[in-house]
Each structure stands twice: as C-alpha cells, then as structure tokens.
C-alpha cells in the first residue's frame, strides 16, 4: 500500500512534468548560446590584446636572449 502512494506521484511526474521540464530547459539553453554584439566586440578586443601581449613577450625574450644567454636555465 505504501508503494502505491509513492508510485502514483512518481508516475505522474515522469509522464507529465519531466518531459515539459526538460523541453523548456533545453529550448531556453539553445537560445542563450549566441553571443551578443557587445560580447563579440569584447572577445575580439581580448584576442587583439592577447596578440599584442604575445608579441611583447617574444620581444622581451629576444632581448633577454641577446643580453643574458643563460637566463632560461635559472
């Protein structure tokens, strides 16, 4: 008898509530996956900054290689 009290609400949940819940969850998730215009601009800006930082690091390493050849061994 106690199993019946648990089985009926669980069956209703699995048959009606769970499919609607999953459908709403994943339909909202797919709509949010696109980046907004400001997010795309920020991403491009960060990529440019990373490129400039990489170039500066390479320049600094070439200066250190010329002035102190064994600096990487430390």
UniProtKB/Swiss-Prot annotation:
It is found in: Cell inner membrane. The keyword Transferase does not apply. It is a single-pass membrane protein. Keywords: Cell inner membrane, Cell membrane, Coiled coil, Membrane, Stress response, Transmembrane, Transmembrane helix. It holds the Pfam family PspB. The keyword Membrane applies. InterPro entries: Phageshock_PspB (IPR009554). The chain crosses the membrane at residues 4-24. One of its GO terms (biological process) is regulation of cellular response to stress. Belongs to the PspB family. The phage shock protein (psp) operon (pspABCDE) may play a significant role in the competition for survival under nutrient- or energy-limited conditions. PspB is involved in transcription regulation. Interacts with PspA; could bind PspA only in the presence of PspC. NCBIfam families: phageshock_pspB (TIGR02976), PRK09458.1 (NF006993). This is Phage shock protein B. The lineage of its organism: Bacteria, Pseudomonadati, Pseudomonadota, Gammaproteobacteria, Enterobacterales. The gene is pspB.
